[in-house]
Amino acid sequence: MLLLQQKQTEALGTQPIGKLLLRLAAPAVAAQIINLLYNLVDRMYIGHIAPTDTVGRVALTGVGVCLPLIMIISAFAALAGQGAAPRASIYLGKGETDKAEEVLGNATSALVFLSVVLTAVFYIFAEPMLLAFGANDGTGGTDNTLLYGFEYLRLYSLGTLFVLVTLGLNTFISAQGFTVTSMLTVLIGAVCNIILDPIFIFGLDMGVRGAALATILSQAVSMIWILKFLTGKKTTIRIRLRYLKPNWSVLLPSLALGLSPFIMMATESLIAVCFNTSLRKYGVDLAVGAMTILSSVMQFSMLPLQGLTQGAQPIISYNYGAGNADRVRHAFRLQV
């Protein structure tokens, strides 16, 4: 089994680039579509919370105010995960599996540490952050979007560990060339979320808290799937206890490489905050909810590009480590 998995990873340096890019990018695009669709379904359920249409509208707006904060969680996952995964691919290209596993172990520790810090910050300061990010407390005749945003964010923050580890470590599965397995991570979480959403939101009458609980439990299932894979026999590199101890000479270069996607995602969060606060000031709370839906629809245009980038990353990193400059240039040209 191990030999088979090694051959699949080594294919990054031997198979024709065009065929390889298509094989890796197609599952990545599918994963992006699945992720977006289940987010849309999640918001559809929230928008139909009883007893009145107004409640659903205000609840959707309240959750929409939480989205910039959730983007920040994703940004930290990118800082530790997207920065470290390419370095692991480079070491695999060099044939240095132990160093690739050390990168993986340090990234895992960083993700756990960041999740503890973010959980504390989001749980303790949920209310002032939501007010700063565009929520209303119901004074002056406005809708109380803070109530729904607070309920959602406080519960969601308790699952930060599941979200960070899932987002951060799934990149290491793709980095080895196992993009189908990476896609299954997203699919498993999406199916669980779609099943649990109506049960918690409507069946147990939990409202937005039910949506948050469904999300974090789904991410927990995805995290278990990832950890089972990265500690099992089907992976080329494994999470090993001896590499969980932070080594700054390994961790800092990974964080430096992850700084770029972190800044990009943090900037998206800032833009969303600007939209929310401007819409609240010059429009009505309904406009914030409408923007929440519109932003989800707009993401469809980015899916092919994101999938292609995710498919090309392990090819470029692996061949860079192996010293195959021609294959690196070829993959880059095809991607562009």
Model-inferred region functions:
Residues 122, 171, 197, 201, ...:
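Structural signal for membrane-spanning alpha-helices in multi-pass inner-membrane proteins
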Residues 19-85, 89, 256-279:
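Signature of the first transmembrane helix
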Residues 33, 37-60, 130-143, 199-205, ...:
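Helix-terminus/linker motif at the lipid-water interface of multi-pass membrane proteins
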Residues 60-120, 163-182, 290-336:
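Small-residue-rich hydrophobic transmembrane alpha-helices
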Residues 31, 81, 156-174, 182-190, ...:
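Short runs within selected transmembrane alpha-helices of multi-pass transporters and secretion channels
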Residues 1-28, 88-161, 203-258, 316-336:
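Short alpha-helical transmembrane segments in multi-pass integral membrane proteins
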